[in-house]
């Protein structure tokens, strides 16, 4: 059976740079940072006191008060980004098509605030004070579950959990389900809210986070010699992915086509990437093979680019191994320099960003890149957005446990 073509017809975000797609995109193009001192708790005793928090979020936009009390924030973020994507797509559900439309939304960690809140209740007041909604409100697949319930989606209902690759993997697998005729459309993405005492403390304990507390907006600086770790972000992003002819029949706005999806595993270490960058390289090559295109077709890469000392130069090395001489003709940027690392939501948000780069023929910048590190000699679109012809974009996500994912997105040509 010939694979069906899959396109993106709806976008939605909740992010440190704004809770609408247009607000987030304009902030990115302006090179604004969403990193600020932590406000969710008193972080004065923590080595890291900064994060890229979501601000001015109102869960009542998408949930009633009763549902808000039953769910963790990561579910609420997912619900709002899914609402935006759904409304943007213009899809309508009826008894006939409901079994052909599904959901794939994951989270790297899940209900961290909900877990902390109920554990505190257990310690201070005993087991009877644990919420009856603790388990259903905290489990990762409840993001997909609540979205499917709200929109009566009776197709595939899954939540892939792969650390920092979660969002991209959910979108990639949703596209494959459509390509192989398991669904006609899916809401897919990722969500995260881990900027809590345990979340910040846990990442600080493995020395993954920046401690540039006196200059929050300059803390996330991918490929720069002065980088000292990533900045934790939070939020959610969803896209509606849909079979091409299905989208055309209802005159949907088609943003881009998903033409390639690659995966690989490092098989090296729990938290450190393979020092030869073989996993990263294999993943990118697999995505190009799946897309059936030459490396020279790619115009822009939205890189994983976390601002960690170990991973940044390895991703640059993998790009060179994948693209050869063309690597130096590519525009490559890390929008985590502005959004922070949104963990399970990162790959989903960066898919949205990649789509907008194609739509507007503009590569967002890598901010805070002042002194590129050794081996980091590609065109990283330093500090200012760039208008350029963009027809094909590659987006990378790599995660703890050596789990890697790459999407290739293209302008739709008929």
Swiss-Prot record:
Free-text function comment from the UniProt entry: Involved in the type II fatty acid elongation cycle. Catalyzes the elongation of a wide range of acyl-ACP by the addition of two carbons from malonyl-ACP to an acyl acceptor. Can efficiently catalyze the conversion of palmitoleoyl-ACP (cis-hexadec-9-enoyl-ACP) to cis-vaccenoyl-ACP (cis-octadec-11-enoyl-ACP), an essential step in the thermal regulation of fatty acid composition.
Entry's Gene Ontology BP terms: fatty acid biosynthetic process
E.C. designation(s): 2.3.1.179
Pathway info: Lipid metabolism; fatty acid biosynthesis
InterPro entries to which the protein is assigned, alphabetical: 3-oxoacyl-ACP_synth-2, Beta-ketoacyl_synthase, Ketoacyl_synth_AS, Ketoacyl_synth_C, Ketoacyl_synth_N, PKS_Beta-ketoAc_synthase_dom, Thiolase-like
The name this protein goes by in its record: 3-oxoacyl-[acyl-carrier-protein] synthase 2
Top EC category: transferase
Lineage top rank: taxon: Bacteria
Subunit structure: Homodimer.
Keywords (A to Z) from UniProt: Acyltransferase, Fatty acid biosynthesis, Fatty acid metabolism, Lipid biosynthesis, Lipid metabolism, Transferase
GO MF term list: 3-oxoacyl-[acyl-carrier-protein] synthase activity
Record-annotated Ketosynthase family 3 (KS3) domain positions: 3-411
UniProt-listed SMART domains: PKS_KS
Lipid biosynthesis recorded as keyword: yes
Pfam families with a match to the protein in the record: ketoacyl-synt, Ketoacyl-synt_C
PANTHER family with a match to the protein in the record: 3-OXOACYL-[ACYL-CARRIER-PROTEIN] SYNTHASE, MITOCHONDRIAL, POLYKETIDE SYNTHASE-RELATED
Entry's family note: Belongs to the thiolase-like superfamily. Beta-ketoacyl-ACP synthases family.
Active-site residues per Swiss-Prot or TrEMBL entry: 164 (for beta-ketoacyl synthase activity), 304 (for beta-ketoacyl synthase activity), 341 (for beta-ketoacyl synthase activity)
Organism: Coxiella burnetii (strain RSA 493 / Nine Mile phase I)
Disulfide bonds: none
Reaction it catalyzes: a fatty acyl-[ACP] + malonyl-[ACP] + H(+) = a 3-oxoacyl-[ACP] + holo-[ACP] + CO2; (9Z)-hexadecenoyl-[ACP] + malonyl-[ACP] + H(+) = 3-oxo-(11Z)-octadecenoyl-[ACP] + holo-[ACP] + CO2
Gene Ontology CC, one term: cytosol
């Amino acid at each position: 059976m010939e694979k069906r073509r899959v396109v993106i017809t709806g976008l939605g975000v909740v992010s440190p740079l704004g809770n609408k797609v247009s607000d987030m995109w304009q902030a990115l193009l302006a090179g604004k940072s969403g990193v600020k001192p932590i406000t969710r708790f008193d972080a004065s005793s923590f080595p890291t006191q900064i994060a890229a928090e979501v601000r001015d979020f109102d869960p009542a936009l998408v949930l009633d008060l009763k549902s808000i009390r039953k769910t963790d924030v990561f579910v609420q973020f997912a619900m709002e980004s899914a609402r935006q994507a759904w409304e943007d797509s213009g899809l309508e559900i009826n008894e006939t098509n409901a079994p052909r439309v599904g959901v794939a939304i994951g989270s790297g960690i899940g209900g961290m605030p909900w877990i902390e809140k109920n554990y505190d209740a257990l310690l201070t007041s005993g087991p009877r004070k644990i919420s009856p909604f603790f388990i259903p409100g905290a489990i990762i697949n409840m993001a997909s579950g609540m979205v499917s319930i709200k929109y009566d989606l009776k197709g595939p209902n899954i939540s892939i959990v792969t650390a920092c690759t979660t969002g991209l993997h959910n979108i990639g697998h949703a596209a494959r389900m459509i390509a192989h005729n398991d669904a006609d459309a899916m809401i897919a993405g990722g969500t995260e809210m881990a900027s809590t005492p345990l979340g910040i403390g846990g990442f600080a304990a493995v020395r993954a986070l920046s401690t540039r507390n006196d200059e929050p907006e300059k803390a996330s600086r991918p490929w720069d010699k002065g980088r000292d770790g990533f900045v934790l972000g939070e939020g959610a992003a969803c896209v509606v992915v849909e079979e091409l002819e299905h989208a055309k029949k209802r005159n949907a706005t088609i943003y881009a086509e998903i033409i390639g999806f690659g995966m690989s595993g490092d098989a090296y270490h729990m938290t450190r990437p393979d020092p030869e960058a073989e996993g990263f390289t294999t993943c990118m090559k697999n995505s190009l093979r799946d897309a059936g295109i030459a490396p020279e077709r790619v115009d822009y890469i939205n890189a994983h680019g976390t601002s960690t000392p170990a991973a940044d130069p390895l991703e640059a090395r993998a790009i060179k191994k994948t693209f050869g001489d063309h690597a130096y003709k590519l525009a490559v940027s890390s929008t985590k320099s502005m959004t922070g690392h949104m963990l399970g939501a990162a790959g989903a948000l960066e898919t949205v960003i990649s789509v907008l780069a194609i739509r507007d023929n503009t590569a967002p910048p890598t901010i805070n890149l002042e002194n590129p590190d050794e081996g980091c000699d590609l065109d990283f679109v330093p500090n200012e957005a760039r208008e350029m012809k963009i027809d094909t974009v590659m987006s990378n996500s790599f995660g703890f446990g050596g789990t890697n994912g790459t999407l290739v997105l293209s302008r739709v040509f008929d």
